[in-house]
Amino acid sequence: MKPTQFAMAGLLAMGVGLAAVPAAAQQRITVNIGSSHPTTNIWVHAMKEVFQPEVDRILKAGGGKYEVRWRENYGGTLYKFTDTRAAVRDGIVDVGMVGTVWENSAMPLQNVTYFTPFATTDHELLIQIFDKLNTTVPALRDSWAAQNMVPLSSLITDSYDIYANFPVRTLADLQNKKINAPGTSANWLRDTGATPVDGALTTYYTNIQTGVTQGALSFASGIGPARVYEVAKHLTRVDIGSMYFGSVATNKKFFDGLPKDVQDAFVQAGKATSKAHGEHVSKVAKAAMDTMKAAGLQVADLPAAEKAKWVNSLPNIVQPWLQATGENGKAVLKAYFDELRARGVKPLRDWDAQNR
């Protein structure tokens, strides 16, 4: 064989050998993702529309070594809203929407906003704050870990106001009125003369229609789809504020077992989900307000003097929460209000200052 033929044969042999070596196999990881609410819900929408595709995009951009196989369990197919914490904690799903608002006994620290009304109406800012607090405040971070969870993206409501079948021009207009204000929000009516009545977005319409109540404390992105404005024609803006609702979270044991690249993809996708969630709530709230106004909703602002009277007449409603949560609660309260002020927010009441 001539040298050139020998060299060519060698190269061909090498080529055959190289061809016989398979490329690095892509690792497929199954992720069970779910929620108690449908994907049309403001707290779930970005999970499906942003978190999942963003994880896929990041992994593909990183070389495609890993691929996620999503098993979707949205809309309460596996569990109801009362079980969002247990579902993620126990691994019924690997990633899920956790409504800490329903977990005041197991996760009280996360409910600080519900005990400190009139702090901020900027729900997009609130997302940024809690994305930070959940990972930097030891008490909050540890409380998630104690539940075998890692928070990835913060969930919020837009600002609460009064939707009623009567106008509210002064605080005196609330005297002897029954207002739907479930759970902790009942505290916001303390010493106003109104009587809080338990309920939910799914019951407000019937409650008001049948005279059980005359109105509800709620937010536009919820009231609009529930069509409560059909029986409550008056919206009084009082700026009770936006509330931290919970987080999209992942089961900690599951997360800790993921390859580092996939963990990083989850964290980065969580940040994108937070941004998209805030923008989506803004869009839904505006669309709801436009629809409600077109249907005849009368909108008015509570005069500043009357609002101040409401804010300052409230008893120290955060004190029982602080007594129950101790030093951890104080740390969370301080961190929350420090973040508000650092971002230019001036709370209408300094709940932290009066509870140092």
Predicted regions and their residues:
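Signature of the catalytic double-stranded beta-helix
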Residues: 127-139
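Bacterial N-terminal signal peptides that target proteins for export
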Residues: 1-10
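N-terminal secretory/targeting leader peptides
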Residues: 26-125, 140-356
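Intrinsically disordered, low-complexity regions enriched in polar/acidic and amide residues
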Residues: 4, 25-26
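Sec/Tat signal peptide C-region and signal peptidase I cleavage site
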Residues: 18-25
